[in-house]
């Protein structure tokens, strides 16, 4: 959420310093999930399985109103255990929503541990393809260039919705966080923060 709020702040919806000072504090509007009381945010989310169904509705409304906007949603792989995701996937195919693109953050981790131990998600490509979706596999979902190519392909896909399966590494960039489920909602200590920022600085300098 910090990244989402930061992007909106950079776009002028609210002051960036306000986000830095108030994020996730008691009584703050900058809570841990999107808050539609803030400008630039149309819907609250957080409860698993809500994002894709709402986006299907937005995409369908756009089609019926003759508007040319596109709808994007990001889902965690753990979220795919929710039945509402698959109901929405069927509806997106039924209405040929080629203005809809879903991105799955496939890092094999959720708040309660490994996704495969909770609810297996093998053959995601074939599952979505069987629901009538155009499926794009990105082997390195942390590669921005690869993701950009996938978004271009999605935009050029006609008559069916697109899902991008982005195989990612949770917490990539710092060994302190990488591939650890405990960082799903962990707030770093001052020492951890300093180490993480130093790791990210090294990566930035290496680019």
Regions found by a protein language model. Give the residues of each.
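Cofactor-binding active-site loop characterized by glycine-rich and histidine/acidic residues
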Residues: 1-94
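A short alpha/beta connector and helix-capping loop motif
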Residues: 82-107, 163-165
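Short, solvent-exposed amphipathic alpha-helical segments in soluble enzyme
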Residues: 10, 87-92, 118-119, 152-154, ...
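Glycine/aspartate-rich loop-and-adjacent alpha/beta segment that forms the canonical ThDP
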Residues: 144, 148-207
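Conserved thiamine diphosphate
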Residues: 66-69, 116-150, 201-207
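Short acidic, glycine/serine/threonine-rich loops at helix termini
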Residues: 5-6, 84-86, 112-116, 174-179
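Short beta-strand segments
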Residues: 59, 74-75, 103-105, 165-167
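Generic beta-sheet signal
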Residues: 69-73, 100, 160-166
């Amino acid at each position: 959420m910090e990244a989402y709020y930061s992007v909106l702040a950079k776009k002028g919806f609210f002051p960036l310093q306000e986000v830095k000072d108030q994020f996730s504090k008691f009584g703050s509007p900058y809570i841990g999930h999107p808050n539609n009381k803030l400008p630039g945010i149309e819907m609250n989310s957080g409860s698993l399985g809500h994002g894709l169904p709402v986006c299907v509705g937005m995409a369908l409304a756009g089609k019926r109103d003759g508007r040319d906007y596109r709808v994007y949603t990001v889902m965690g792989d753990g979220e795919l255990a929710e039945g509402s995701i698959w109901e929405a996937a069927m509806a997106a195919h039924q209405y040929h929503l080629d203005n809809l693109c879903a991105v799955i953050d496939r890092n094999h981790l959720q708040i309660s541990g490994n996704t495969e131990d909770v609810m297996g998600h093998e053959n995601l490509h074939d599952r979505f393809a069987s629901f009538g979706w155009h499926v794009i596999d990105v082997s390195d979902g942390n590669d921005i260039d690869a993701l950009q190519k996938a978004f271009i392909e999605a935009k050029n896909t006609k008559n069916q919705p697109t899902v991008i399966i982005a195989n990612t590494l949770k917490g990539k960039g710092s060994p302190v966080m990488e591939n650890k489920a405990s960082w799903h909602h962990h707030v770093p200590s001052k020492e951890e923060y300093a180490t993480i920022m130093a790791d990210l600085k090294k990566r930035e300098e290496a680019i």
